[in-house]
């Protein structure tokens, strides 16, 4: 099994998979009589159908045991999905490019700095949320509507990957 190299999350490296939601290096303008900086349109919510809705939820995630064997990835073909950390903790991201199925050799891993969120583009393969802390909270912006919006792909045993953030 291949061990994933964990990269620091940057806008450039993550661009094939989605958006990095952060203020560092992002354009802004002043509002509210000059008392507030607005970092505008850091990500776009994607939905497949006009009758779909963008919704906001909170996910409370428990940490998985590490090192983790990455056995599966999922994708949301009908909408984007954003994760914004509420407690300021770094978290892990495992992604693969768009396609009918994820290719094990193209899977990448990232770690946030705790002040970054991410927005997976519609159809991007990714691992379910991976917190480093024992428990963590995330603001999630995604799609509500009819139709199946979660495809799962389970890797064959020889395609599985190892995620070991502390090695």
Swiss-Prot record:
Reaction(s) catalysed (UniProt annotation): (S)-ureidoglycolate = urea + glyoxylate
The keyword Lyase appears for this protein: yes
SUPFAM superfamilies attached to this UniProt entry: RmlC-like cupins (SSF51182)
EC number(s) stated in the UniProt entry for this protein: 4.3.2.3
Pathway assigned to this chain's UniProt record: Nitrogen metabolism; (S)-allantoin degradation
Keywords: Lyase, Purine metabolism
Record text on subunit structure and interactions: Homodimer.
Family membership noted in the UniProt record: Belongs to the ureidoglycolate lyase family.
NCBIfam families hit by this protein: PRK03606.1-2, PRK13395.1
Name of the molecule in the record: Ureidoglycolate lyase
Organism encoding this protein: Pseudomonas fluorescens (strain SBW25)
Gene: allA
């Amino acid at each position: 099994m291949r061990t994933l190299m964990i990269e620091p999350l940057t806008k450039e490296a993550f661009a094939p998979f989605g958006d990095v939601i952060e203020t560092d290096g992002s354009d802004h303008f002043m509002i509210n009589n000059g008392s507030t900086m607005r970092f505008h349109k850091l990500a776009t919510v994607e939905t497949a159908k006009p009758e779909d809705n963008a919704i906001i939820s909170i996910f409370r995630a428990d940490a998985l045991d590490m090192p983790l064997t990455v056995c599966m990835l999922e994708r949301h073909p009908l909408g984007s999905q954003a994760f914004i950390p509420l407690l300021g903790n770094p978290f892990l991201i495992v992604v693969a490019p768009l396609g009918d199925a994820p290719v094990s050799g193209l899977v990448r891993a990232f770690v946030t700095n705790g002040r970054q969120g991410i927005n997976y583009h519609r159809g991007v393969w990714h691992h379910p949320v991976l917190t480093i802390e024992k428990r963590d909270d995330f603001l999630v912006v995604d799609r509500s509507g009819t139709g199946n919006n979660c495809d799962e792909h389970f890797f064959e045993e020889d395609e599985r990957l190892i995620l070991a953030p502390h090695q």
